[in-house]
């Protein structure tokens, strides 16, 4: 298999993704149910038309209303009793051809507008091609799909897209679509999140090609929406004001900034014009209150006068403002100076919250949405019954049948690897249900800590000296048991305050105590000190730091202290445990490097922050030690721009550490969605090859490129209740599926490698996009599962392989390195993310790790 000629990125060559090399056989069989429902599709052709609506750039909801109105209006002349389905953009499908000329037809459609005015639209409908579901049947039987599901093409001849549109047409008219999910306003339940937001429940629905058949993936889903309420109340929620009437003064600057950040970009409707509820988008909040905010008003005689907003509302609407001391919303285009007093505006219903939730909101959300596996299974079954596909007129029009029972699948529970510890007795731990115990065991290679310091950023009142003493004694006891002895008392133990004292203190420590190995930093809750400690320690001075929350110092538990030791040992160059060598797959017989890669994007609404790409690589044969590389790149760019130089660095580092050149590169890539598979693979595979060739022109190690996906909606349930594990009744750790619900012929599998503690476990989905090493299904599944046991932060198997997890941690840590002390306060009170005033060079320098830290696992 060879990639076509290396053309420009735009023109992608034909790319042969490897076919499945066979099925896995290892492990104990387990009967499962998957939330996939078989869709029977007739072997017919359907007709695709391109729809062009002018004015364009309307939201899909409006487009749907236009097309719906068009079908009703031109029923007699064009549509007859056909029921077309429409994707909200440019594709319209019919089961029978329409009587329109090959040149297409232009139609006029009007929708009732706001305030009694009609909105005119021009719609052109033009035949594009027939779409064959015969071909789809052949592909599902193991042929090849006509083309990958390119979801970004404007008019898609892809038969899978046609199936998807048929099944989404009715719900798109009935509910509020968000991505591939549908939501409706809460009725009979109320889940406020605070800050003017609330939880809406709904369902996810997507069509997936599976073996021999099409499957409909259905899952329960929840997301945050803004509560429809008066803007005054919204402001009170955002600013924690309990009673607006007790706020007789104008907003403070910091309050106004916080309120602006939340309401900017939202739609509001006005209440002072009777039934004419005009809607506007908020672009800003005025600095001045309504009583002082002026604008130029043109009088009937043509002269222009300055009026305050409060005056204008009194004169024009005989409305005496109740809160003239509050600011106004500036709406529409900034240059137009349209101001509305807060008290005449409501937040428009049905607006999804794309801004990042606060920590409290996130935890409320999880509590409201976490369901044990059996509950979720029941809820999904209920959803499918209530969706009632057999009565959906559009599903009937295209002769579909949707089964209403979940797909039965046979999975396998893979054996867990044994883990080798150190100490005199070199004990072995065998995980049970994804968990093992370190009690009575010592690290494989423990570090001796001779020189260490404590910096306490909690106040002396919060954390008295005897509490600190008790904590250090406990920590030393646990660390000695774990085989990582901390010798004697700290060489330095002082209280400090505020982020500004971090750098001078650390510089003093570095200059005074040569051979200082570790600084333990005690933090008083969520604080900007953390970001500063990591910036100074990781990037500026190259010092190992371990932060601990003060609550865990006051109330120590062996579990917390033991977890602390897991992190400290690794940061200082130790090895906690290794996979017992003789049970590892044969890929370990020659030098192999495991790479993990991830790109994290700034939260929505933060246009100015860069995306961060991280790649980590294993540095030994176990594999247990990793080295990290990190770069900033253009916001929202998924391809790792600088991958060639990052991989090159890691290969050099591997050679320095092991004196071997890897003969194989196993690359786990997180965070790529299916629509991007081909372009990301094309660019990144060539980049990895380029890195190899830049070291030696004949150096061509075999590359295996695997995408790891966690953000999908496939869930697996035990068919037999007795197999359920734990309080939430999940599938056992190690459950693997590579038949029935997987791709008809590509090499993919689901593996749930962790024990679900809360809610329903989400199996990770692995898709092999390139494989020079010709892995069998068993080898790759087992290797992947074993790597999930090598994550150093806990004694549990985690949900994705350690290298992919570490890449995520590295990128996440780099976000902290980018926090700009001058602008970013930890609460994020500043509008949008900073790091905007800094040029790309400054950003690149900010995430650069100090030479002394570079070779350590500082991110652990």
Curated annotation (Swiss-Prot):
Task: Identify the EC number(s).
Answer: 3.1.26.n2
Region called Interaction with guide RNA, residue ranges: 530-567, 758-805
SUPFAM superfamilies listed in its UniProt record: PAZ domain, Ribonuclease H-like
Where Phosphoserine occurs, the residues are 825
Domain spans labelled PAZ: 230-349
Instruction: Please list the residues that carry the modification N-acetylmethionine.
Output: 1
- Report the enzyme's class at the first EC level: hydrolase
Q: Which GO terms describe its molecular function?
A: double-stranded RNA binding; endoribonuclease activity, cleaving miRNA-paired mRNA; metal ion binding; miRNA binding; RNA binding; RNA endonuclease activity; single-stranded RNA binding
Which Gene Ontology cellular component annotation is one that this UniProt entry carries? RISC complex
Provide the protein's localization.
Cytoplasm, P-body
Domain Piwi span(s) in chain numbering: 518-819
CDD domains registered for this protein in UniProt: PAZ_argonaute_like, Piwi_ago-like
Matching entries from SMART domains are given as: DUF1785 (SM01163), PAZ (SM00949), Piwi (SM00950)
Task: State one Pfam family annotation.
Answer: ArgoMid
Q: Which GO terms describe its biological process?
A: miRNA-mediated gene silencing by inhibition of translation; mRNA catabolic process; positive regulation of gene expression; positive regulation of non-canonical NF-kappaB signal transduction; pre-miRNA processing; regulation of stem cell proliferation; RISC complex assembly
List, alphabetically, the InterPro entries matched.
AGO3 (IPR028603), ArgoL1 (IPR014811), ArgoL2 (IPR032472), Argonaute_Mid_dom (IPR032473), Argonaute_N (IPR032474), PAZ_dom (IPR003100), PAZ_dom_sf (IPR036085), Piwi (IPR003165)
Q: Does the keyword Repressor apply?
A: no
- Which cysteine residues pair off into disulfide bonds? none
Q: How does it assemble?
A: Interacts with EIF4B, IMP8, PRMT5 and TNRC6B. Interacts with APOBEC3F, APOBEC3G and APOBEC3H. Interacts with EDC4.
Q: Which family does it belong to?
A: Belongs to the argonaute family. Ago subfamily.
What role is this protein assigned? Answer: Required for RNA-mediated gene silencing (RNAi). Binds to short RNAs such as microRNAs (miRNAs) and represses the translation of mRNAs which are complementary to them. Proposed to be involved in stabilization of small RNA derivates (siRNA) derived from processed RNA polymerase III-transcribed Alu repeats containing a DR2 retinoic acid response element (RARE) in stem cells and in the subsequent siRNA-dependent degradation of a subset of RNA polymerase II-transcribed coding mRNAs by recruiting a mRNA decapping complex involving EDC4.
Q: What is this protein called?
A: Protein argonaute-3
- Which organism is this protein's natural source? Mus musculus
Recorded name of the encoding gene: Ago3
